[in-house]
Amino acid sequence: RGFGVRGALGVSDRANAAASQLKPGDVDWDDVFGRRGARWFHTGGIFAALSETTAEGVFEAVKAAKRYGTIVSYDLNYRASLWRDIGGQEKARAVNREIAPYIDVMIGNEEDFTACLGFEVKGNDAKLKKLDLDGYRAMMDEVAAAYPNFKVIATTLREVCSATVNN
């Protein structure tokens, strides 16, 4: 017999992963998007935060993709634990704001849009028990106005009822 339900525990242990070792110039993006003709490129905030060099690699990739007319999607996916060692939220915001003008499809929840781009949903309670849909619409309108290059902006809405129930 135990005591209660253990909360979820996530570990972003990507230290020394092959992707974290990538540096600008390691991938021939002109070959990927030009010669090979990749039509869609997806990346995101987790990859950008893996090391000091991966954010530069993402920037290099999205610029090359746009040169060839490749659709670029990006999941903000802010993870404080990954950004902590390379400059924290301030660095995350600077990096994501630099990348955003090259993105066609931007994905993220309200916390991602706040942490990574500085947009906030007004009207939600701190525990997200009751969502203000007008606040979400207003934030998305602000995002679309700031980044007219976004062809699609996607988010999720979740009301937290309890530790085990979400709507």
Question: Model regions: which residues?
Answer:
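Conserved N-terminal subdomain of the carbohydrate kinase-like
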Residues: 1-45, 69
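Flexible, glycine/proline-enriched loop segments at strand-loop-helix junctions
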Residues: 9, 13-17, 21, 43-53, ...
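Acidic/polar active-site rim loop that often engages polyanionic ligands
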Residues: 39-46, 118-124
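Active-site core of PLP-dependent enzymes with the aminotransferase class I/II
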Residues: 51-59, 164
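Surface-exposed amphipathic alpha-helices with a cationic face
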Residues: 59-66, 144
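Short, conserved structural micro-motifs that define repeat-unit consensus positions
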Residues: 66-72
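Conserved phosphate/ATP/ADP-binding segment of small-molecule kinases
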Residues: 68, 79-167
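Acidic/charged, solvent-exposed loop-and-adjacent secondary-structure segments enriched in E/D, K/R, S/T
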Residues: 75
